Structure formats: C-alpha cells, structure tokens
C-alpha cells in the first residue's frame, strides 16, 4: 500500500508487502512522523522533491561509497588534508601524484622513485615522502616544488604533525629519525630495528612506531624516548587520533590491535587477516583498514565492531579526513579509490529509508528539506538507505 503522511502522526505498516509512506509535502520545523513495522512486508519512507533524511545516526546509515580514480600504480602510501581537498598518493612503481580537488584531478609530480610512504600537514600543503633506498623528499607548497635530504636509507614510513613542522621517519633495520623544523634538520632516535610504520598525534608529541616481527614502540615526548609495548607481531601499519589517546595497529596475518590509553595497553579488535594500512578520524571513532586480497573494513565505533566496505582486492594503503567523512584507498597494481561516507539519503524522490518487521523510526523536520531521526528501533540489524 501507499500512504501520504501527515505531520505529527504515527503509522503502523501492517501488510505482507512493503508499505510506502511519503513524507509530508510542506512540513514545518519541529513536525515529526513515526513509522513502525508490524507486518512481514515492512515499510519504505519516500521523499518529496528537495527532501532528504540524515542517516549518520542510524544502523546501515554509515556506508562508504567508493569510486575509482584514473591513476594506477602499486600504491604504498596515501595522505589527506584534514578537509580532504588535498590528497597525495605514492607508488612503489615510481609515481607521486597530488590532487587539490578531493581526487577529481591528479597531477604527476615526481616520477621514477621507489616511493614507500607519504604524509602531509593538516592543510595538505606541506608534504613529506620517503623513498625506499633513497632520500626523504618534502614540499612546502602542495607538491609544486621539492627538496630532498640526499640520504640513501631504506625508508619505510613517515608521519607529520598537523602543522607540518614535527616530522618522523623510520628506516628498515635502521633508526627512527625526527625533525622539529619541517625537515631542515633530523635527529636519529631509538635503536636499529625492523621498523615498518609510524604514526603521529596532531601536535607530534605522541608517536607509535611498529616493527616487523617484534614489539611496537610508543613515544610521548616528540620521539626523544621510546617504550616497547604490546607483544611481538608482524606489524604492518599504524594510526593515531589527534590527541594521541587512541591508537590502531595492523598485523600481517593477524588482527587489528587498539589502544585507548596513549599506547600503554593494547588488545586485538578483529579476526586475523592480511591487514595492511589503517586510518582513523581525528577523534578515533571512524576507522578504515585495508586487507590484501579482501575488502576494506570500516568501524564507526572506535574499532569495537567492523564491517566490510568496498570490493575485494589487493588493498594496501588508506587515509582519512579529520572528520572521517571521506577516505582515499589504494590497490596494488590498480587504482586509487576515493570514499564518501553516506550521511544523508539521496535528495529527492529517489532517496529514502526502509525498514522491516518490528523496525521503527521517528523523524523530525529540522528545515532546509532535512528530516533527522530522533528515535529508532532496529530489529533487523540495519535500515535500508537510498
């Protein structure tokens, strides 16, 4: 059946087939509509022209839509500005690309180096990139001009503070190197280890560096001193929240491990897989991790629960905006993908939300064509979002 909803009215969908309920055509701010599924057919909320529904707080409403970019490479490192407008992608096959419009267009910058990692400041203008067996390269202007340090180390990973001044780089079977002046000078830290990856808090004070086959190490003094944490694993990648309190680290043929106490204690949060890159929002709530030969996985609750996103492939690296609404992810030998988190239904008559038997949803009109959920019961794990 089909019903045109009236404002401030509740509806019981009691049929063997889905009941279509269209939102009020001229709602006033504060008006509400409630739908409860009694029958086995469930319900389907339809929208009018110019209307949409906020779904960020609904089960099933936090999916990420992925789209392939035209650039192809063996992607080893990705970086995103806080807003997601400026992106950097580096490949072991020799490419370094930048984008200034959220991946709409890509510009080749430095070609022919075996790139291993890249990091950027929060505005995306200051870029630090590493070459495995070569130098560290940095750009102050979004990739238009570059300097390098002239070294020839087995650089594996780099990380940057939000302002781009405090930098850290790891060398495989070498040391950890830190800079407090945007890369002009570097100081060797810690011992020679099989360093695999490194991540930084926004101020550069809290750092985590992971090793291939041994423990991971945490610093809370800008990299001056390091403390061994967790246990020996084949660690692959790491990510840190802006304040440094929440950390994630992936293990090759292991789990994703998490810490919520500045890296002091760690616990596994996932099943064992061939985990690769991991990225987190600034607050540590939104997390995306890559697997080699599987899908990307995402968490919307700080790593407590995970579900698949994107398709299957040899995913390698991933980066996130500060708010966790947009992502960039790379497949080895394939494309770079941009991801957009679904925060609203599609505007207009093609969008809407559906539920099943025993599902209930109450929406309130907040203006501008937007209805927001104020209560729900999700008996079927998640709602359908269009």
Segments from the language model and where they lie:
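Conserved Ser/Thr-centered positions that define the repeating blades of beta-propeller domains
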Residues: 80-81, 98-100, 121, 139-140, ...
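Exposed extracellular interaction/assembly regions and N-terminal maturation sites
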Residues: 1-60, 368-386
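Blade-level signature of beta-propeller repeat domains, shared across WD40, Kelch, NHL, RCC1
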Residues: 316-341
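Loop/turn residues immediately N-terminal
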Residues: 93-96, 133-135, 173-175, 213-215, ...
């Amino acid at each position: 059946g089909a019903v045109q909803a009236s404002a401030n009215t509740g509806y019981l969908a009691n049929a063997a087939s889905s009941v279509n309920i269209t939102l009020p055509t001229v709602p006033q701010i504060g008006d509400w509509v409630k739908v409860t599924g009694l029958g086995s057919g469930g319900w389907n909320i339809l929208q009018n022209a110019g209307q949409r529904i906020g779904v960020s707080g609904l089960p099933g409403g936090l999916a990420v839509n992925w789209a392939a970019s035209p650039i192809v490479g063996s992607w080893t490192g990705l970086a995103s500005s806080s807003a997601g407008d400026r992106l950097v992608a580096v490949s072991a096959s020799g490419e370094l690309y930048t984008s200034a419009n959220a991946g709409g267009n890509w510009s080749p910058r430095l070609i022919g180096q075996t790139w291993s990692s890249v990091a950027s400041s929060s505005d995306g203008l200051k870029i630090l990139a590493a070459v495995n067996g070569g130098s560290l390269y940095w750009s102050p202007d979004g990739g238009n001009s570059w300097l390098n340090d002239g070294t020839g180390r087995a650089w594996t990973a780099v990380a940057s503070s939000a302002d781009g001044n405090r930098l850290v780089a790891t060398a495989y079977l070498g040391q950890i190197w830190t800079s407090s002046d945007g890369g002009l000078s570097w100081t060797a830290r810690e011992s020679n280890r099989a360093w695999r990856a490194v991540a930084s808090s926004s101020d550069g004070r809290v750092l985590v560096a992971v090793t291939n086959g041994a423990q991971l190490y945490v610093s809370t003094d800008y990299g001056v001193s390091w403390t061994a944490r967790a246990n020996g694993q084949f660690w692959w990648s790491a990510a840190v929240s802006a304040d440094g309190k929440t950390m994630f680290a992936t293990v090759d043929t292991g789990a994703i491990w998490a810490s919520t106490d500045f890296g002091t204690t760690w616990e596994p949060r996932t099943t064992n897989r061939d985990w690769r890159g991991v990225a987190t929002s600034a607050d540590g709530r939104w997390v995306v991790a890559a697997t080699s030969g599987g899908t990307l996985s995402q968490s919307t609750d700080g790593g407590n629960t995970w579900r698949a996103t994107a398709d299957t492939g040899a995913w390698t690296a991933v980066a996130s905006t500060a708010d966790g609404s947009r992502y960039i992810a790379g497949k080895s030998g394939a494309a770079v993908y941009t991801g957009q988190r679904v925060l609203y239904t599609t505007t207009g008559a093609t969008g809407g939300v559906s539920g099943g038997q025993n599902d209930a949803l109450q929406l309130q009109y907040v203006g501008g064509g937007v209805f927001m959920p104020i209560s729900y019961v999700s008996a079927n794990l998640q709602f359908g979002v269009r």
